[in-house]
A protein has these predicted regions:
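Accessory, often C-terminal, charged low-complexity segments
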Residues: 1-82
Length: 82
């Protein structure tokens, strides 16, 4: 099943109770990224234009490393920016 929730006006999609969490909205906030990480997903997808700056994109990896206790390798394997 797929569910949707709004955080800071941005839609977060969750598939199969957290097997996959995705957001495709532009200019997402830290709150959106944190809400996604709190779902403890196996895989995460963002659209490239979710981020206003390249630094914002780098920050998602750090957020997931902290919230999920993922290693550098797990972050690279489990997060996709398309």
């Amino acid at each position: 099943p797929m569910t949707q929730e709004e955080v800071d006006g941005k839609t977060i999609y969750t598939v199969n109770n957290g097997d996959l969490v995705a957001c495709f909205a532009e200019n997402i906030t830290d709150n959106v990224v944190k809400a996604m990480a709190e779902k403890q997903p196996l895989r995460v997808i963002f659209r490239d234009n979710c981020f206003a700056q390249d630094a914002d994109k780098i920050n998602i990896y750090e957020t997931f490393k902290q919230k999920m206790d993922w290693s550098d390798q797990e972050v690279v394997q489990n997060i996709r920016v398309i």
